[in-house]
């Protein structure tokens, strides 16, 4: 995992000074090279067993993602992304994977799918860890976080595409979002294993 910082620094050219802090670690901006590296990371995660996760300590965080609109984000096995008001829902337990400074991917523990955003700003669950599944995690002044696509933004401005949930829990398209809207504000909430559905406890412990 030592080369991850160098690889993902090239995903976001706005991380001023980040590459210099990496010393002589080679940076690559070829989409093919990046996708290959993402595949390698995905493979390590999929092959992981309970004893294999020691090297990922501090890199993996299991959380619920609560939106200011009152919903927890869920990733379903069919690739659908939606919000629920149910605390500790089966598909609302998420794995936050730190890739580099401020860059993360989010995976559903039960569904095994990664949160992705396509060029239209639509959220979906991806079987593969691709560049569409990499987000910039930003801590805002109101103690909430925002999650912006590192791949897509408005072509006529610097405005980012953000992960967002509407007031009815449906996903809001990234092109319709702004950083200071409540739709885009999230709190990563701790997971209490005792509150998980019984069918999900083993997944939470071992996946």
Swiss-Prot record:
Single Gene Ontology BP term? positive regulation of brown fat cell proliferation
Q: Gene3D superfamilies this protein is in? A: 2.80.10.50
Top-level lineage group: Eukaryota
The answer, when asked if Hydrolase is one of the entry's keywords, is: no
Please give the residues the UniProt entry marks as glycosylated: 78
Q: Which GO terms describe its molecular function?
A: fibroblast growth factor receptor binding; growth factor activity
Arranged from A to Z, the UniProt key words for this protein are: Glycoprotein, Growth factor, Phosphoprotein, Secreted
Chief location: secreted
Instruction: Indicate where the modification Phosphoserine is found in the sequence.
Output: 111
Where is it localised? Answer: Secreted
Question: One GO cellular component from the entry?
Answer: extracellular region
Q: What does this protein do?
A: Plays an important role in the regulation of embryonic development, cell proliferation and cell differentiation, and is required for normal cardiomyocyte proliferation and heart development.
**Family named by the database record:** Belongs to the heparin-binding growth factors family.
Q: How does it assemble?
A: Interacts with FGFR1 and FGFR2.
Protein's name in the database: Fibroblast growth factor 16
Species assigned in the record: Mus musculus (Mouse)
Chain's gene name = Fgf16
């Amino acid at each position: 995992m030592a080369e991850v910082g160098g690889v993902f620094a090239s995903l976001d050219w706005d991380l001023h000074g980040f590459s210099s802090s990496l010393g002589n670690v080679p940076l690559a901006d070829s989409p093919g090279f990046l996708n290959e590296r993402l595949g390698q990371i995905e493979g390590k995660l999929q092959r992981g067993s309970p004893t294999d996760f020691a090297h990922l300590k501090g890199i993996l965080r299991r959380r619920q993602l609560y939106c200011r609109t009152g919903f927890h984000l869920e990733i379903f096995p069919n690739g659908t992304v939606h919000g629920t008001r149910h605390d500790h829902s089966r598909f609302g337990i998420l794995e936050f994977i730190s890739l580099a400074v401020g860059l993360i991917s989010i995976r559903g523990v039960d569904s095994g799918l990664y949160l992705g955003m396509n060029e239209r700003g639509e959220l979906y669950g991806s079987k593969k860890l691709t560049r569409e599944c990499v987000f910039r995690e930003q801590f805002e002044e109101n103690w909430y976080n925002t999650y912006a696509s590192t791949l897509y933004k408005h072509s006529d401005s610097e405005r980012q595409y953000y992960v967002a949930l509407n007031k009815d829990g449906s996903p809001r398209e990234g092109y319709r979002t702004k950083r200071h809207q409540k739709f885009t504000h999230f709190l990563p909430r701790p997971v209490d294993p005792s509150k998980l559905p019984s069918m999900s406890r083993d997944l939470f412990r071992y996946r």
